[in-house]
Amino acid sequence: LHYQEVKWRKLGSYEHRLHLKPGRLAKHELEVFNGYFVHFPAPENMIPIG
């Protein structure tokens, strides 16, 4: 699963959107800010969605 995550503030509240691309493999890392990455392991009990 490959995804993009967008969060922005509008009129005092935050909106959060995920753009998903099923079928694409993604590395176990997430770019947080200005090239900094957070690494995370995939859960072993993860079940694919239909």
Swiss-Prot record:
MF GO annotations: serine-type endopeptidase inhibitor activity
Gene Ontology annotations for the cellular component aspect, listed alphabetically: extracellular region
Give each disulfide bond as a residue pair. none
Q: Where does it live in the cell?
A: Secreted
- Chief subcellular site? secreted
Give the family, as the similarity comment puts it: Belongs to the ITIH family.
State how it assembles. Answer: I-alpha-I plasma protease inhibitors are assembled from one or two heavy chains (HC) and one light chain, bikunin. Inter-alpha-inhibitor (I-alpha-I) is composed of ITIH1/HC1, ITIH2/HC2 and bikunin.
Q: What does this protein do?
A: May act as a carrier of hyaluronan in serum or as a binding protein between hyaluronan and other matrix protein, including those on cell surfaces in tissues to regulate the localization, synthesis and degradation of hyaluronan which are essential to cells undergoing biological processes.
This one is known as: Inter-alpha-trypsin inhibitor heavy chain H2
Organism of origin is: Bos taurus
